[in-house]
Amino acid sequence: MLPARYRMTRSTEFSTTVSKGVRSAQPDLVLHMANVLDDPSGPRVGLVVAKSVGNAVVRHRVSRRLRHSVHPMLDELQPGHRLVIRALPGAASATSARLHQELSAALRRARPRVEASA
């Protein structure tokens, strides 16, 4: 489970991160990452798992796998970093290891671009 202080809950946080952040696409997910300098409360993560991924059981399984994958990465993030992870339909059939690998690759690609734009 992702601790509450790391969770994105407001729609404004999601929309700001998606619109102003950098995007890094992988086959089964898309990562949007932004750096919010005026809020040093810690890195925050939001998940978007649409109905196109599958029924409620499948969507919840994908969400759990993504939360589990992002949890160890929180220590590597700066306090102002905001992440929105959008699962694509292929995430339903992807293994946990594959989702973790894709998330790591997306984060590796996005982080230098976010830090350069800050």
Curated annotation (Swiss-Prot):
One of its GO terms (molecular function) is tRNA binding. GO terms for cellular component: ribonuclease P complex. Signal peptide: none annotated. One of its GO terms (biological process) is tRNA 5'-leader removal. RNaseP catalyzes the removal of the 5'-leader sequence from pre-tRNA to produce the mature 5'-terminus. It can also cleave other RNA substrates such as 4.5S RNA. The protein component plays an auxiliary but essential role in vivo by binding to the 5'-leader sequence and broadening the substrate specificity of the ribozyme. Belongs to the RnpA family. This is Ribonuclease P protein component. It comes from Mycobacterium sp. (strain KMS). The gene is rnpA.
